[in-house]
Amino acid sequence: MQVLVKVPGSCGELIQGKVSGKDLLVTCPINLYSQVSIKESNHNNFENINKKSFLAITRTLEYLNIKTTNYKIKLVSELLQGKGMASSSADISAVIKAIGLINNVDLSAEKIAEIAIGIEPTDGIFFEGIVAFDHIKGEVLQYLGQALP
């Protein structure tokens, strides 16, 4: 079995600040993606997996209570690093989702947020559409609608 997960980047923060004492971040997904492919293998083979993505692998496996693995995991990103395109958030969330799916667990966006927030503050780009998101606590404050195609 092979799993392929794509998570969009963003065009930067549309809104960032605090509302009623809660941190708030609104980002808009774009048509550029981080893509993770994963399949079972004879040994672990990680391609283009950086430190944060590796943490996403280990923390997701811990959550799923999986002790040993043999996966070939490849991450390919169209997103520029360090340019406000949510590249780390897209990489991390794509890895989390893929690890769940290869183990027959469809992790919710809320669970992905919980795991991702344990690694770094994260954008809510893995939620459907556009959300007002507490990027520190990993909580959706409000669903704002679908992004334009």
Model features per residue range: what roles?
Residues 1-83:
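ATP-binding N-lobe of GHMP and related small-molecule kinases
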Residues 3-4, 101, 146-149:
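C-terminal nucleotide
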Residues 16, 31-35, 90, 138, ...:
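Short capping/connector residues at structural and topological boundaries
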Residues 21-23, 108-149:
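ATP-dependent small-molecule kinase catalytic core of the GHMP/sugar-kinase superfamily
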Residues 65-72, 99-115:
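Phosphate-handling active-site elements
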Residues 83-107, 125:
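DPxDG-like acidic metal-binding loop motif
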